[in-house]
């Protein structure tokens, strides 16, 4: 069983989201209980002790003031799941973005080198998280996410978007398949 702790993991924030009053964070590998380089592993499909992953997810949710971290089984798509109530799943469906108007939900997008995109319309109370790698970006995952937010009452001109840390072109080779 994973060691329980009140230690909360550190996280980064995007000024634009902070100024709008949206509670959010981009978490690093630090502050979890898993072994190895990725001690804050929150991936349910990872080769890690499920009890450790659950504890890590609880720590992230607690740091955000929520009861549970909600995430998806990410597949590098443009598919968006809209939540109008708190889900009861343990492992979410295959998609790459979550949108909700339910207060208190902690939406997560897991990333390493891909982009974690957080968006909010603070007036409408609509938030979103998206996992945007090169494939999802080329499939317009962000546009699909904003469209889903609008269907819940968000207005494009009020939506603020924060981009999390991600890999840059200088850090890897891009082949002719792009």
Put a short name on every predicted segment.
Residues 1-178:
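Active-site microenvironment for binding and transforming phosphate-containing groups
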